[in-house]
Amino acid sequence: MLRVVEGIFIFVVISESVFGVLGNGFIGLVNCIDCAKNKLSTIGFILTGLAISRIFLIWIIITDGFIQIFSPNIYASSNLIEYISYFWVIGNQSSMWFATSLSIFYFLKIANFSNYIFLWLKSRTNMVLPFMIVFLLISSLLNFAYIAKILNDYKMKNDTVWDLNMYKSEYFIKQILLNLGVIFFFTLSLITCVLLIISLWRHNRQMQSNVTGLRDSNTEAHVKAMKVLISFIILFILYFIGMAIEISYFTVRENKLLLMFGMTTTAIYPWGHSFILILGNSKLKQASLRVLQQLKCCEKRKNLRVT
């Protein structure tokens, strides 16, 4: 019975990975076509970077998980876990700072506040956002340098061989340090989401005072952006829970189902958010509908040939 359950978990994880690669690949392809036509916008650049980093992150999650499931001795007898940790940090941080840039973009484009600094930033969104992306990238690189030092110190402490049976407290502390940058970026996204909610609440109060009774375009934009941001926050919390479950597997190595459940939960974030972005972006949604229509036409042609 245990093997059947393991097979189901592996099937689900592989399916999530395939959907994630397809969804993020579609986002990247649509924006790359716009880039070839010299039509790539700021949000297109952010979505492309987010899609590429998510695909990279999916491969790292799957590679790490399958090694732990099928060949855990590889980690104990080599430095592979060190390289996987480096790649995971790169994928995780780049994905997070692109997602944070997207949150800031929605906030500057849609929110309404009378603060002078906010109005100045809002009027120069297309100029400010590239600097913001560079700032997030630099902070990510600085954090990565600190993470590299942590990993290197731990490697030297264990005589160049990673000890997978370390004390629980030491391992959890190391994981918290590795995720400091991600927590910082997530906090920024959470702040922008809260500010968007405040902006929507104020806007609704103004609309009620005008007694229009109708939802204007600004309200629709607020709601659409909030759906994307709130879904991102929920999915990232699931991702973090999945990571915590996978980390706890290092202390309970006999229970592989724990690892598989953690992988399944972790993989929801990179593939689920990609489809939410497609549905929430009019250009991506229209492109996906055209692809589906073409697939239906191809299916009808095949059926006609068979008959």
UniProtKB/Swiss-Prot annotation:
One GO cellular component term, please give it.
membrane
Side Extracellular, residues: 1-6, 64-100, 148-179, 249-257
Query: Which keywords does this chain's UniProt record carry?
Result: G-protein coupled receptor, Glycoprotein, Membrane, Receptor, Sensory transduction, Taste, Transducer, Transmembrane, Transmembrane helix
What Gene Ontology terms describe what this protein does at the molecular function level?
bitter taste receptor activity; G protein-coupled receptor activity
Protein origin, superkingdom: Eukaryota
- Biological role stated in the UniProt entry: Receptor that may play a role in the perception of bitterness and is gustducin-linked. May play a role in sensing the chemical composition of the gastrointestinal content. The activity of this receptor may stimulate alpha gustducin, mediate PLC-beta-2 activation and lead to the gating of TRPM5.
Q: What is this protein called?
A: Taste receptor type 2 member 10
Tell me the organism: Pan troglodytes (Chimpanzee)
Lineage start = Eukaryota, Metazoa, Chordata, Craniata, Vertebrata
